[in-house]
Amino acid sequence: MQKLQISVYIYLFMLIVAGPVDLNENSEQKENVEKEGLCNACLWRENTTSSRLEAIKIQILSKLRLETAPNISKDAIRQLLPKAPPLLELIDQFDVQRDAGSDGSLEDDDYHARTDAVITMPTESDLLTQVEGKPKCCFFQFSSKIQYNKLVKAQLWIYLRPVKTPATVFVQILRLIKPMKDGTRYTGIRSLKLDMNPGTGIWQSIDVKTVLQNWLKQPESNLGIEIKALDENGHDLAVTFPEPGEDGLTPFLEVKVTDTPKRSRRDFGLDCDERSTESRCCRYPLTVDFEAFGWDWIIAPKRYKANYCSGECEFVFLQKYPHTHLVHQANPRGSAGPCCTPTKMSPINMLYFNGEGQIIYGKIPAMVVDRCGCS
């Protein structure tokens, strides 16, 4: 009996020395583990708006396959930008990206931009420096954006200077070829007759799709073209080498290409604004202003709504995969927590100068956040 009492005293003494036992210790450890696992892989949610904008700039350059932003000044843009109907229509009717209601579908976009149209300006060529002692216009060089897409349309646009009296104008588009035995250097592409009235000059388009297809199949046959637009007195009205005051009137090629559509799937998420107190994963508005970047090489849009995702992702909230919660409960230390990320992204249309001075109209995929979710 005495031994039992001694054992009890020793036990009580150990309790006093060791201090009280915290019965909540295990639960706190478990909670800490859960907090650690919540978003070790998604600390980017704490990024500021400025870092998000910097990321968008890097994305755009990467998707356009540009190492740096094209160095084109506003003055150069005024000279290079054609004052022609197809380009003016693109700018006037440009679908500036808006945060319109989404159907919740998720498009499987490619990473790089998809080209829809290319406006190609003439360039200098060693093959077309002089013919018959005179410099000739025009030589067009084609990038891979045209070569590796399905050609839908190819139009040559030329500007005809105004006439003082009603006149009939004969337009000829000639293709330069290698000298034949009889000395012939040209073969006809198109010819047409136009009746012009006094007033302002006019833009005229000519279908050159067949010629362009041949050039793409046999690049060595592309030696350039000559443009003539003669009135009854033999005066050439075509602007081939712009004179002072004729900026933006240089001939150019408008090429349209097509691509195959992508499949889609369904998804949904929460929408918030900057004043929202919502702590869960949500989509927030963010406007990208290219003029603020100093990116004058982007013709349109000047700004667009990109949006971003932010918020907490608890394991029981907006689970993308139902089994994720069970896996985490079984092994809380071994599973990374879900992250608030875009679950639907859509492209933006863009009209821009590339590094070669060509005007490109196309789509840049995955530049607008339409939905956010936890995954």
UniProtKB/Swiss-Prot annotation:
One GO term (biological process): positive regulation of macrophage chemotaxis
Keywords (A to Z) from UniProt: Cleavage on pair of basic residues, Cytokine, Disulfide bond, Glycoprotein, Growth factor, Heparin-binding, Secreted, Signal
InterPro entries: Cystine-knot_cytokine, TGF-b_C, TGF-b_propeptide, TGF-beta-rel, TGFb_CS
Glycosylation sites: N47, N71
Keyword Metal-binding among UniProt keywords: no
Pfam (any one): TGFb_propeptide
Signal peptide (from-to): 1-18
Site note Cleavage, residues: R98, D99
Assembly and oligomerization: Homodimer; disulfide-linked. Interacts with WFIKKN2, leading to inhibit its activity. Interacts with FSTL3.
Similarity comment text for this entry: Belongs to the TGF-beta family.
The protein's name in its UniProt record: Growth/differentiation factor 8
Gene symbol of the encoding locus: MSTN
